[in-house]
Amino acid sequence: MEYAMKSLSLLYPKSLSRHVSVRTSVVTQQLLSEPSPKAPRARPCRVSTADRSVRKGIMAYSLEDLLLKVRDTLMLADKPFFLVLEEDGTTVETEEYFQALAGDTVFMVLQKGQKWQPPSEQGTRHPLSLSHKPAKKIDVARVTFDLYKLNPQDFIGCLNVKATFYDTYSLSYDLHCCGAKRIMKEAFRWALFSMQATGHVLLGTSCYLQQLLDATEEGQPPKGKASSLIPTCLKILQ
């Protein structure tokens, strides 16, 4: 009897809908919990030349992408080169080794005939230039200018001026030029109006002088036609 009641309860619509909803939620959770393939992310890379005089920051997805961007950035289109680690000169040849490197790794570009050298050996090549540098330098005043935009559509943007005295006192000022585009439009509008007015004046003057010369050549007194010149010039200006 109890078994029959349990069977009837399973066929009851409420219990049936409950089982269906629970099963649907389980399937949904399984679908959502499945790991999705991660999209490749660009990693920041720092690249220097063989003499360490030029450093560039490049965002690359892979080793091949880094090589292409290094060729374009350093203008090495027709020059063979390869990448090594700046700290020890290890050649970077495989994608697995590139992905295993840390994010702050610095790469060095070596062209044909160039060899990796530690920074100490490069520093001994110019002992005279290093000897002229003072041991300690004290900045009396330093002024920095930072031009940035709050909106990509800004014409000029904002200018931040910062002055530092004796590395102790600092003063900064922000100059917002967001409305510079509107000011330039008004200036251009007034300049256009001035040029149009000047053109009308010159055109009216030339018309008056032309009719004056025609009247003089025909032997008629210019005063007789002076009254009719103004309406003619006004018609031309319109």
Curated annotation (Swiss-Prot):
One of its GO terms (biological process) is negative regulation of triglyceride metabolic process. GO terms for molecular function: lipid transfer activity; molecular condensate scaffold activity; phosphatidic acid binding. The keyword Transmembrane helix does not apply. The keyword Ubl conjugation applies. Keywords: Activator, Apoptosis, Endoplasmic reticulum, Lipid droplet, Lipid transport, Nucleus, Transcription, Transcription regulation, Transport, Ubl conjugation. Residues 1-35 are annotated as: Required for liquid-liquid phase separation (LLPS). Coiled coil: none annotated. Gene3D superfamilies: 3.10.20.10. Ubiquitinated and targeted to proteasomal degradation, resulting in a short half-life (about 15 minutes in 3T3-L1 cells). Protein stability depends on triaclyglycerol synthesis, fatty acid availability and lipid droplet formation. It catalyses: a triacyl-sn-glycerol(in) = a triacyl-sn-glycerol(out). It holds the Pfam family CIDE-N. Belongs to the CIDE family. It is linked to In omental adipose tissue of obese patients matched for BMI, expression levels tend to correlate with insulin sensitivity. Expression is increased 2-3 fold in the group of patients with high insulin sensitivity, compared to the insulin-resistant group. This observation is consistent with the idea that triglyceride storage in adipocytes plays an important role in sequestering triglycerides and fatty acids away from the circulation and peripheral tissues, thus enhancing insulin sensitivity in liver and muscle. This effect is not significant in subcutaneous adipose tissue. This is Lipid transferase CIDEC. The gene is CIDEC.
